[in-house]
Amino acid sequence: MNHTIRVDRNHPACFILLLDQSYSMSAPMVGAAGLSKAQALADATNRLLMQLVQRCVLDEQGPRHYFDIALIGYSDRITRLLKSGDGFGNPLVSSPQLADSFVRIHEEPDGQSWPVWVEPLADGQTMMCAALDLAYDFAAGWVASHQDSPAPVVINITDGEATDGTLDDLAERVARLVGLSTVDGPLIMFNVAVAARAAEPVLFPNDAARLADPYTAGLFHTSSVLPTRMLEYVRTEADRHGLPRPGAGARGFVCNADLAGVVRALNVGTL
């Protein structure tokens, strides 16, 4: 139960990303000139998916089945953003399926390009509780058939409060999620609070002392303590970038996240 199982074809990982697509995501993204939060989040997610596929390619045979993934968008409704296409209605998409399911190629003026799986959306309210309910259904089904795999990881990225429940309702749903486990350990929960305005990001804290409001503190308390391998990676990256080193008990939580903070959280959560 120490989160030490390594990913391979016999032990695939499970990643479930929850993306806030409410109206407030139309506001500008801190640290991403000219981009809305919705566009910046879509770009970061698409780049992450591309990197995950690339990590699964070791030879000319194409991506190996190293992970299963689901993307859940939430606003006035809950949307499954990836389709498996396997004909069996599986809620999670395997890495080989993901490699073949992008909708278009995005090209930048400087020549950079990447596949697009997710388009930006910013409309309606913030049905975060319902998104967590669906994440539970997906994760519960996955752990039932993958007990020898690494524990699943759920990453929730939002810029506001849930409109379909209280903080207690949110905590209750996260408690159900982290109650799921494999032989590797319990499910790992990340929360990323996207910045509404320029402020010092709080990266992987071990207490809520620097958090400005009860709701943000509540998101912190519903985030998992980082397993050792994730904490070691976060500390190495902090040293490399001249950032404060997270202490013992650091959680999978980022507050006042600019674009760089979102990317760091995604990278840590999908180790």
Predicted regions: what they are:
Residues 1-271:
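Acidic, low-complexity intrinsically disordered regions
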